[in-house]
Amino acid sequence: MSSEKASSKSTPEAPWPVREVNTQVKQWIERLGHLWVEGQLAQINVKPNWKLSYLTLRDVEQEVSVQLTCPTDIIRNRPTPLKDGDRVIVYGKPAFYAGRGTFSLWVTDIRPVGIGELLARIEELRKRLAAEGLFDPARKKRLPFLPNRVGLITGRGSAAERDVLSVAKDRWPEVQFEVINTAVQGASAVPEIIEALRALDQDPRVDVIIIARGGGSVEDLLPFSEEALQRAVAAAQTPVVSAIGHEPDTPVLDNVADLRAATPTDAAKRVVPDVAEERMLINQLRSRSAAALRGWVQREQQALAAIRTRPVLADPMTPINRRRDEIAQAVGLIRRDVTHLVRTEQALVASLRAQVSALGPSATLARGYSVVQVIPRDGSAPEVVTTIEQSPPGSQLRIRVADGSITAASMGTQQAN
């Protein structure tokens, strides 16, 4: 097919044949040139009598892979044999085989990712996630005291699974587990663990999730430091416990998880309470409560006894009698003061009466004096005679003396000298 035909747009009336499509794809892919690509090896297919070997290189975070084709001598001449799960960097050129319509990366160099480089990348990821706040204690979720059901993600038939289940059952025989077995190393570990984590997180019966694995090399534990897994754990609504390796092992998952356990056995102890210890604690609390109650009763009894010994309770009439005596004494004082006051006032009244009597008309009459009144003939009130003109001869008079009055008549008047 001419280049003019190849560059033209395909139509229902003029479609491209398969060979042309593959040719165009091959030309486009080959323009990419040589590339360095990082991933994890899987499905290494090497035959002694083959000149070419075929491998699968998987992405370390997502379920994405690419086929590798390389000379068998590159694999055979390596100082250490390649194995599934190895983290490597390959150098190759993308190739598209037009006849079969398949894509592969033609590899001419395979280099293992060094331990130092791996650790540096892990630390770089750790710093970046810490800066985002994924390690912040404030975002850590508290574990339930007694979980209804425990989710467990671990390798099938692994020692970690046996340790978690046996220790948990010994501590609390009624504990229930929801176990999902996944790959715990290699290229498929991260996507399988993430899928299991999401399934358990969506299960309403699961109250806490344990991700457990036994010890291993740095390469073996790499899945638990992959960013995709850290993001999934941070997004989970259910508390997650990291129980990876042994005490010295510190994958990034330990920092992101809500709780880090030193070992799978330690995880079981941290998640499931010990029924024997709880019973002992209950007995101790019961004893403390009883002792506290007895102490309170004893203190109240002592306080009541002290109150009973008070005089007011020993003889309730004592304060009443005391108040009665005080009232009687006050009444006596009041009576005495009133009597004295009355007598004083009586003496004063008698003295005033004597003074009034001495100055009054009766006293004057008693000394021989008399009061003469003229009685008018018109029947009006008598008038005291003070002049001779008031009693002409023939006037009727009344003379008041000390012991009575005398009726008389005026016989005549005489002017004073």
From Swiss-Prot:
One matching Pfam family: Exonuc_VII_L
Organism superkingdom: Bacteria
Catalytically driven reaction(s): Exonucleolytic cleavage in either 5'- to 3'- or 3'- to 5'-direction to yield nucleoside 5'-phosphates
EC number per UniProt: 3.1.11.6
Keyword Nuclease: yes
Keyword Ribosomal protein: no
Subunit structure: Heterooligomer composed of large and small subunits.
Matches recorded under NCBIfam families: xseA
UniProt protein name: Exodeoxyribonuclease 7 large subunit
Organism taxonomic ancestry: Bacteria, Bacillati, Actinomycetota, Actinomycetes, Mycobacteriales
